[in-house]
């Protein structure tokens, strides 16, 4: 059955997200990549901030969300779009200037804690700043998780497929989740929302603003 998953009305939610992304398109490469990955993969804040270098498979465009960083300790493997893949490559170039070591993917550039993993609090502060700039104070990382899942439902994904993509163990209290392979999810993603995400996320591909 078709379902709507969202904090805002579907139309307003999509408009707000697009407005936010347009503002975020002027941000630094780390911020743009993190937003794109959160949106593509329907990530919770902690899942996003704790992504490690070894969690991404660029050849297949797959992200492994490790169970220990999820709300319900249920890991998953999810695909991401070509645009997000390009942003990933660009961020890796900058990350190497901060650290050549494997480990947390998202590092701080602040002189006080240079090359330290970005914290949930720091990321929330970044998103909050962009939300205020866009005059959309209710936008958060979780907004993009809701939008991603709503769009999967809109284009015909089965509720069990959405549960697997989102890392939900159950649908309400009666429906059990269905295990889908990463290949199944990737094929479904490419045939459905990949083009829609690509259209929206191109605003994050803009060049970094001059210092």
Where in this protein do the model-derived segments appear?
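Conserved catalytic core of the tyrosine transesterase superfamily
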Residues: 1-211
């Amino acid at each position: 059955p078709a379902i709507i998953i969202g904090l805002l009305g579907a139309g307003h939610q999509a408009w707000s997200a697009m407005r936010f992304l347009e503002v975020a398109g002027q941000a630094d490469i780390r911020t743009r990549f993190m937003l794109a990955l959160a949106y593509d993969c329907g990530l919770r804040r902690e899942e996003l901030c704790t992504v490690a270098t070894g969690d991404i498979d660029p050849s297949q465009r797959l992200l492994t969300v490790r169970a220990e960083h999820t709300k319900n300790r249920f890991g998953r493997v999810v695909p991401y779009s070509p645009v997000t893949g390009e942003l990933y490559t660009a961020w890796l170039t900058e990350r190497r200037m901060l650290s050549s070591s494997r480990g947390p993917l998202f590092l701080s550039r602040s002189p006080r804690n240079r090359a330290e993993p970005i914290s949930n609090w720091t990321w929330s502060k970044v998103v909050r700043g962009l939300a205020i700039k866009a005059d959309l104070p209710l936008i958060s990382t979780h907004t993009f998780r809701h939008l991603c899942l709503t769009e999967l439902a809109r284009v015909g994904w089965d509720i069990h497929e959405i549960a697997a993509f989102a890392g939900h163990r159950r649908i309400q209290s009666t429906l059990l989740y269905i295990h889908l392979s990463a290949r199944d999810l990737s094929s479904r993603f490419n045939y459905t929302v990949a083009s829609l995400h690509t259209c929206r996320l191109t605003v994050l591909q803009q060049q970094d603003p001059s210092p």
